[in-house]
Design a protein with these regions (language model features):
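An N-terminal assembly and electron-transfer interface module characteristic of large anaerobic redox
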Residues: 1-221
């Protein structure tokens, strides 16, 4: 089986449509996974996916200036992601959303919740330190603590965050700054779909693409 390497593709012909016989890179999944693609695309019309998929398409469309897109062929963004989350929730008829956040981003989580509530949504939120569990109770060796090994240091508790929100049955959950790995544990345990508002990057002010663009990060990545 040939592994896809789309991140290395120089032309992205799939984003422009493919006339019959168009040349494709050898690693292109369009030619190596054609039957799989044809089969899975049918699922977007099915009841399990259709509403989410159409709402996502509408949210994407409404995120751009309509006149610039239709008349000038330009994609000019007009909404930030937090607004798109509110509009997407409205499009799927959501009333309650879950918010799982890192204690280090408590202020940002509060601001996000307030904005979403302004749009008429009910927000249920759970902090990562919920439970006040010391890291050693969760199996982390004391020497792996960030500060003093003998002092209390709250363990991140993504499974508890997910399980509490599972019982509250939000339409979807929003992540705000969970650590690498903890975000994966939360996502794997959450029964509701999960999206991310803020991805944690301590060094860049939670803007991980900065380390891809700036030469100042070159020696530390």
């Amino acid at each position: 089986m040939i592994e896809p390497k789309c991140a290395r593709c120089p032309d992205r012909p799939c984003s422009r449509g493919l006339p019959e016989g168009s040349p494709l890179p050898g690693f292109c999944p369009i030619q190596n996974y054609k039957s799989l693609i044809d089969e899975v695309v049918k699922e977007y019309r099915g009841p399990a996916v259709r509403d989410f998929y159409l709402a996502a398409a509408l949210t994407e469309k409404n995120g751009y200036d309509a006149r610039a897109a239709r008349e000038e062929g330009r994609t000019v963004p007009i909404r930030p992601r937090i607004r798109e989350l509110a509009e997407f929730a409205r499009a799927i008829g959501a009333r309650r959303l879950g918010l799982a956040f890192c204690s280090g981003l408590h202020d940002e989580a509060g601001r996000a919740a307030a904005i979403l509530e302004k749009h008429g949504l009910e927000i249920v939120s759970v902090i990562c330190s919920c439970g006040a569990v010391d890291k050693t109770e969760a199996g982390v060796p004391a020497e792996h603590k960030i500060r003093e090994p003998g002092a209390f240091e709250a363990a991140c508790n993504p499974l508890v965050q997910a399980e509490i929100l599972n019982r509250l049955e939000p339409s979807f959950n929003i992540l705000v700054g969970l650590c690498v790995g903890h975000d994966m544990l939360f996502t794997s345990r959450s029964k509701a779909p999960v999206t991310t508002l803020i991805v944690k990057d301590r060094l860049t002010g939670h803007n991980p693409v900065a380390s891809l663009y700036s030469r100042y990060y070159r020696d530390i990545v």
